[in-house]
Structures are given as structure tokens and as C-alpha cells.
UniProtKB/Swiss-Prot annotation:
PSII is composed of 1 copy each of membrane proteins PsbA, PsbB, PsbC, PsbD, PsbE, PsbF, PsbH, PsbI, PsbJ, PsbK, PsbL, PsbM, PsbT, PsbX, PsbY, PsbZ, Psb30/Ycf12, peripheral proteins PsbO, CyanoQ (PsbQ), PsbU, PsbV and a large number of cofactors. It forms dimeric complexes. [CaMn4O5] cluster binds at residues 169, 188, 331-332, 341, 343. Chlorophyll a ChlzD1 binds at residue 117. The lineage of its organism: Bacteria, Bacillati, Cyanobacteriota, Cyanophyceae, Synechococcales. Residues 344-358 form a propeptide. Cyanobacteria usually contain more than 2 copies of the psbA gene. 2 of the reaction center chlorophylls (ChlD1 and ChlD2) are entirely coordinated by water. The D1/D2 heterodimer binds P680, chlorophylls that are the primary electron donor of PSII, and subsequent electron acceptors. It shares a non-heme iron and each subunit binds pheophytin, quinone, additional chlorophylls, carotenoids and lipids. D1 provides most of the ligands for the Mn4-Ca-O5 cluster of the oxygen-evolving complex (OEC). There is also a Cl(-1) ion associated with D1 and D2, which is required for oxygen evolution. The PSII complex binds additional chlorophylls, carotenoids and specific lipids. PROSITE patterns: REACTION_CENTER (PS00244). Fe cation binds at residues 214, 271. Chlorophyll a PD1 binds at residue 197. Tyr-160 forms a radical intermediate that is referred to as redox-active TyrZ, YZ or Y-Z. This is Photosystem II protein D1 2. The gene is psbA2. InterPro entries: D1/D2, Photo_II_D1/D2_sf, Photo_RC_L/M, Photo_RC_L/M_CS, PSII_D1.
Amino acid sequence: MATAIRSGRIGGWERFCQWVTDTNNRIYVGWFGVLMIPCLLAATTCFIVAFIAAPAVDIDGIREPVAGSLIYGNNIISGAVVPSSNAIGLHFYPIWEAASLDEWLYNGGPYQLVVFHFLIGISAYMGRQWELSYRLGMRPWICVAYSAPLSAAFAVFLVYPFGQGSFSDGMPLGISGTFNFMLVFQAEHNILMHPFHMLGVAGVFGGSLFSAMHGSLVTSSLVRETTEAESQNYGYKFGQEEETYNIVAAHGYFGRLIFQYASFNNSRSLHFFLAAWPVVGIWFTSMGISTMAFNLNGFNFNQSVLDAQGRVLNTWADVLNRANLGMEVMHERNAHNFPLDLAATESTPVALQAPTIG
């Protein structure tokens, strides 16, 4: 009876606190979720509206607007939320900073609204992962793994614009805009020749390879619990204590396929490796983008091989450099008078006076 009376006196704030932190809810909210939900809702709503109906944005700050929305002629592939104008630079540009809504849209205000709310939302999502793990008594490595894609998002949406001096250099929010960002990044920073990007490629493709290898090995060494007429999936019951596959058989197969010590004999160390490999690789990629944001670029091996007479023997580094120069001169064509990359090459002799005729 005393318990019933005491629970009846719980105020609204206490009930809200209990609901927020209740791990028996179908979807755990958590205190980080209180921040995450409105931020991601705001970012998603603004993104959808801008992707469909936003007017053209003066991204380069030279009064040549670029249209990114569907009703301005784009499709799902070519459409994007265009980054805020180079005229805005790194200034914080909420709606109330503009003289009118039309000016805010023309200068790409929706991009900042989406990006800032998105970054806060996904950061809170990582905090929510830690919070739920803590309340369930689990180890905290889920949020550590999630920090890899989180760091990548911060690198392309925040750190890179900071380093370049304008949010107009941030990654557009669309498919073709992402590809354009990648091509321009290669042209300006030679990211393919940066060792941190190479480690990131090894992390992503290596992680895909290891995931496929692990899944196929487990699927091929399942303990048979069903007949030929039934699906093997029916041989597993959620929460069962016994192993569903024979790790000894998988270890023996893979050890003989390559060599003994290439195969894990400990399931825990195996799954740690499967998590750590791509996470560390993506961490390195994020660090690479963050350093190239401040123009600490990839290796330059241009014209590094010469013959005995001092003539250049072109390598693939020179081929890549030619491609970089082509991409550099083609992007933002009307914003550059003369690209510095071309001005930095060997000078071409020109006649300083007219030749004498006769």
C-alpha cells in the first residue's frame, strides 16, 4: 500500500526521467536521444524539402547560381542540397542572419541547417549507444566502432570546410555532388597518393573481404539440425546455449587453405579483428581528409624519374598529375582566372619583341 501511494505521488518530471532511461522500452530513448531525435528530425525534414524545392544557390559567390532540387530540373542522381555560398564563407548563417528568406535560400542557408543538425544528431546517436551499453552492463566498444563513420562525416562536413575557409567547399548532399566532391578533392589534394587514404582503402576493402570470408566459413560449417527438406535456418533457436557452427572445422579448413596461423582459433579475437580492421582504416581516412583540409596533401612524385640525359621518363604519377590538372581547370570554371597549379609548372618561352623581318 505504501508503495502504491509513493508511486502515485511521482511528478511528471520523474515519470519522464523513468521513461527516458527505461531499457524495457521497445526503442531506447536515453538522454542523448532527447537531443538526437529533434536534431535528426530537423535535418531530415529540411533535407527533404530542400532536395525537392530549394531554389538555385550561388555556391561560388560570383552570382552564378547552381540548381540542385528536383523541381528545378534535377533527378535523384543529379539532385543535391547545394553547399552555402562562398560569399558566406565560414560565417554561421541561420535564417535570422539573412535579410529575407529568399536571400537565405539564395546563399545556401539550408545546407548549414541540415549539416549542423545532422552532426549534432549523429554525435548524440553515438552517445546513446554508449548510454544503452552502460545501462545494460555491456562493454563500450559499439560506440567506439561507430566513431569511425562519425569521424568521416565530421571530416567532410566540418573539418574540411574549416581548413579551406568556406562551407562552399563542404560535400554537397547528393549522389552526383558527392562524386564531384571526390573528383575535386583528388584534383586539389592528390588524395590517391596519401598514405592515410591508402590505409582507409585497405580498411574498407579488407573489411569486406574478411566479412565475406567469415560469413562463408560459418555458413559452410553449420551444425546440421534439420533434414534436407528444411531450411538450415530452422536449426537455430534464438538464445540457444550450444554453438550453431563448428569453429574447429572452419579453423581446420582455412588453416589448410592458406597456412595454420592465418586462421583464428579464438572466436573472441576473431570478432575483435573483424571490428577493428575497418574501424582503424576509416579513422585513418578521416585523419587524412582532416590534414589535407589544411593542404598537407598526398605524395608528389611528378617527373621524378630521369634518364642519363636528364629527360623526364613519365610514370603513373605523371599520368595522375595530368588527370588532376584536367579536373582542376574544369571545376569552378568561372571562379578561377588562372589556376595556380598550371602557373606552377615549367614556364613556356614567349617572344618579348617582334622579330625583325627582312
